[in-house]
Amino acid sequence: MSEWLFDLGNSRFKYAPLDGTRAGDVQAWAHGAEAMDTAALSALPSGKVAHVASVAAAGLTERVLASLRTRFEQVRVVRTAAACAGVRIAYADPSRFGVDRFLALLGARGDAPVLVAGVGTALTIDVLDADGQHHGGRIAASPTTMREALHARAVQLPPTGGAYAELANDTDDALTSGCDGAAVALIERSLQHAARTLGMPVRLLVHGGGAPPLLPLLPTAEFRAALVLDGLATWATHSAAP
């Protein structure tokens, strides 16, 4: 493969070959906030062009870019644009709109309105109408981050564990139920608001490493594990130099 897509998130690194206008088979692993295992970097593919999106710390981003520059003839780093591939961003200053959210919207663009919920370190929610106009969104802590924050302030509260219940009868279950339920409630409220605003049903797309536990609570949701990489593929196709 001559062109590859790289998505460097806050806690996970994903990459895939560019397969036409979509991402091919995805590989992924977790990384620390400021570092990535040397063996992982040495295992990166090589080719003609690397298309890179990063929301990770600057030091880690630069280390990954330096490694990619030894493996690819060209390394292209995506930045959020006011408009791309039929999507128009609502932010007055597009540079303040996260590149992961931007690419998720490119990946979600279709012929029907959509709400995109990304569940990672943060929970992000964005609404896109059928004409590609972004109507804004929300940012909150993801369930994982909520649990970690509670544990940091009250160490007796475990950072993991428990199962969802509408009314839990032990602490672990209550924590999972509260944090997962808060995320689901925000998504559902946003979906209802989007449908009222646009005057029609709105499709729900969910992505991110923290999304699977929420899917049983969101019966209309479609899970798109590679949504950001698919958006990066769209960006790569539409922004390629002539």
Swiss-Prot record:
Belongs to the type III pantothenate kinase family. GO terms for biological process: coenzyme A biosynthetic process. Catalyzes the phosphorylation of pantothenate (Pan), the first step in CoA biosynthesis. The keyword Nucleotide-binding applies. It comes from the Bacteria. Keywords: ATP-binding, Coenzyme A biosynthesis, Cytoplasm, Kinase, Nucleotide-binding, Potassium, Transferase. It catalyses: (R)-pantothenate + ATP = (R)-4'-phosphopantothenate + ADP + H(+). A monovalent cation. Ammonium or potassium. This is Type III pantothenate kinase. Its cofactor is NH4(+); K(+). Pathway: Cofactor biosynthesis; coenzyme A biosynthesis; CoA from (R)-pantothenate: step 1/5. It comes from Xanthomonas campestris pv. campestris (strain B100).
